[in-house]
Amino acid sequence: MGGSVIHKINLATFEKELLQIGSNPRAIVLSPDNSILYATLNSSGRVVASDLATKKLIKSVKTGSASRSLDISSDGSALYVVNFTSDTISKVRTSDFKVLQKIKACNEPIGITYEPLHKRVWVACYGGAIKVFSDSLVR
């Protein structure tokens, strides 16, 4: 945490590119086609999208307080975000960055993963619990 850039490193040449992403990035995921980098910005409670070809920030949305971890659906249509101090998870549609759903998860959620086979969202809570939610919301 800290800073405002993501370092993209070419593993063949070790050349480094810097992507300006916003203050205090916490977690990142790539779109299924590797063209968009999604990141949580912990201090502002936002999720941002950066086009990797243009290196430009293209979308941003507030999801809660202290956005931490995130995951993406297998088809790339939705992001799932845990918001640590607001004790919630948010579902964001990637096409327009609309928050489709925000629900109480647990006290201080810190990790999240999307399970495509059964369309479930698994959430790790700071106190040690694991919560499982059905992703039944229509996209």
Predicted features along the sequence, with ranges:
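Predominantly soluble domains enriched in secretory-pathway, periplasmic, or organellar proteins
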Residues: 1-139
